[in-house]
Regions:
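Conserved N-terminal/central alpha/beta ligand/cofactor-binding core
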Residues: 1-175
C-alpha cells in the first residue's frame, strides 16, 4: 500500500485503509500489530530504496484488486505491482540459468513459450477488446526474433512477471 508507483498515479490510499484491510483478512491475534505497522511504514521505503539503488523497477496494477475489495480498507486496484518487463539478453549467459515462467503466466503452445505481463494477460485471457492486435504484435515479435531462436531455442527474451523481477535483481547484483 501507498507505494511510489500508486502515488505517481494519484491513487487514494492511506495507512489506515491498509491497516483496516489487513486486519479484515487476517485471523484475529495471529499477526502482531507491530508487524503490520512495520509492513505499512517500511514497505514503501523498501520499494523506494530498490527503485533508487538498483535495476528493480515496478509498475502499478491499477485494475488488480485486493482479494476482498469490499472488506474494510479494501481497494479495487492500485496496491499490487509487477516488475517492469526487461530484455533478458542483458543477463548474457545467465539467461540460460533462468527457469521458464510458469505455464499459467505465459502463452505456451508446443515449444513456444511467449511471456506477457499481468495487464497483457488480462486482455488476452479475457478476450477483451484489442486482444487480437496485442497477440499478433507479441507473437510476430517473438517468432521473428531469429537471433534468440538460434541461440536459446524457444525461450522468450522479453522477461515479464517473476522472471523480470529475478533478472532485475541479478543485474543489480552485477552492478
Amino acid at each position: 500500500p501507498n507505494n511510489r508507483y500508486a502515488k505517481a498515479e494519484n491513487v487514494d490510499d492511506s495507512d489506515q485503509d491498509a491497516r483496516d484491510y489487513i486486519n479484515s483478512v487476517s485471523p484475529k491475534g495471529k499477526i502482531k500489530d507491530e508487524l503490520i505497522e512495520t509492513y505499512i511504514s517500511e514497505g514503501p521505503k523498501m520499494i523506494d530504496y530498490l527503485h533508487d539503488n538498483s535495476q528493480v523497477k515496478y509498475r502499478n496494477l491499477a485494475h488488480y484488486p485486493d482479494y476482498f475489495p469490499d472488506n474494510p480498507g479494501g481497494k479495487e486496484g492500485n496496491r499490487s505491482m509487477e516488475p517492469e518487463p526487461i530484455n533478458g539478453t542483458q543477463l548474457g549467459n545467465d539467461l540460460g540459468k533462468l527457469r521458464e515462467q510458469h505455464p499459467q503466466t505465459a502463452f505456451t503452445m508446443g515449444p513456444i513459450n511467449m511471456n506477457f505481463t499481468q495487464v497483457e494477460g488480462q486482455l488476452l485471457l479475457g478476450a477483451l477488446p484489442g486482444w487480437k492486435t496485442l497477440f499478433a504484435k507479441l507473437f510476430t515479435k517473438y517468432i521473428l526474433d531469429l537471433p534468440m531462436r538460434l541461440k536459446w531455442g524457444w525461450k522468450d527474451r522479453r522477461l515479464t512477471m517473476g522472471n523480470a523481477g529475478v533478472a532485475r535483481l541479478v543485474l543489480s547484483l552485477k552492478d
